[in-house]
Each structure stands twice: as structure tokens, then as C-alpha cells.
Amino acid sequence: VARPKTISDQRVLDAAHRVIGRVGPGFTLAQVAEEAQVSVGTVATRFGSKDRLVRAVFDNATAEVAVTMRTVAEAHADPVAALRAAAVGTFLSLGDASTAANHLGQLGHDLIDPVLRGKLATHFEVIRAELARAFDRAAGQLPGAPRAEVAVRVLLSLVNGVSIDWSVRPHGTLADRLGEDVDAVLGAWAARDEGGKG
């Protein structure tokens, strides 16, 4: 009879996320095991290899960002505030500047690996879909915005670019930086174009 699984996969995945934030792509399974307070054998048995663990961490992050963006958006009755919250909520899991830089280092590794690059594309598509969902609700209050497809692409490019720039040159918090830049775009879109739409 198989022994019950008392250590959840989520516990190991959360530990791996924290270790990557502290160490970057050079992390080891032993460091993850220590962080999760389990044996290296447990980590290896669950995930097989470091590469497979990273893929599982990526899948977990993709699922979590969708939940986070939708949850923070639904906390606002005002559609524009909800869109802002969704955009600002995209990369809050990066943490502070030092952990964000290490996650950025992991991103460089991800781009080399074709499987991880595919997972990154899926991650961005999930973010795009949540931004599109929020934008659809807010579009009526953003008369200066381009068509939905372009608007969502602009927001996705904005949050991706800000997160990378802030990771390299951190000033203040990431949430504040994202909020300021998202506000600049949404504020412009909220203003009616007197020469065109009006």
C-alpha cells in the first residue's frame, strides 16, 4: 500500500520560488529541499530533475498570476480601477529588487530552453487574456484607447517592460512603479480626443 503523501507538491514549488528569488538560476535541488524542509530525495522523486522542477514552478506561477489578476480586479467596482489593479498585479510575486533580479536571471535561462520558452509564451498569453477581460469591462470609460487588441498589447508590453527595467534599476517599489506607468496610459485613454473621438 502506498504511503500517504504528507508533503504537498505546492510546498516544494513555493520553496523553489523563494530559492530562485534568493539564488537565481544557479539554485540546487538541495537548496530547495532545505527551504521546504524535506529531503533531496523527496524533491527528486516528485519532480525528477531540476529542469522538471523549474517547469513545474513555471506552470504554478502561470496558474497563480491568473487568479491574482482576476481577484484584485474583482475587488473594484469601477471598471477602470479594476483594469489598473489587474495590470499592477501581474508581477507582484517578483518581490523586492534583489529577488526580482534573480528571477530575471532565471528568465534568461528560460529563454534558452525551448520548453521553458513555450511556457513563458503561455504565461504571457494568460496575462494577456486577463488584461483583455478587464479591458472589455473598462473600454466604455476609455474613449481615447485604441481598439481592444492593441490596447491590451500595449498594457502587456508596459507591464513586462516595467518589471524588467525596475529589476535592473529599482527605484521605490515595483507596485508603485507599475501603478504610476499604468496610470499614465489609462489617464491618457480616459481623456476624450477633441480632434477625433468626442
Predicted regions and their residues:
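Helix-turn-helix
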Residues: 7, 11, 15-52, 56
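Solvent-exposed, amphipathic alpha-helical segments
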Residues: 15-22, 68-75, 102, 106, ...
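Residues in soluble alpha-helical coiled-coils and helical-bundle/repeat scaffolds
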Residues: 24, 48-52, 56, 74-77, ...
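Hydrophobic alpha-helical connector segments
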Residues: 56, 70-100, 145-155
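Short, basic, alpha-helical segments at the C-terminal edge of helix-turn-helix-like DNA-binding modules
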Residues: 59-66
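Amphipathic alpha-helical segments used for helix-helix packing
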Residues: 81-82, 94-118
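Short, solvent-exposed amphipathic helices
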Residues: 102, 115, 119-133
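Hydrophobic/aromatic-rich alpha-helical bundle segments in the mid-to-C-terminal region
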Residues: 117-121, 138-198
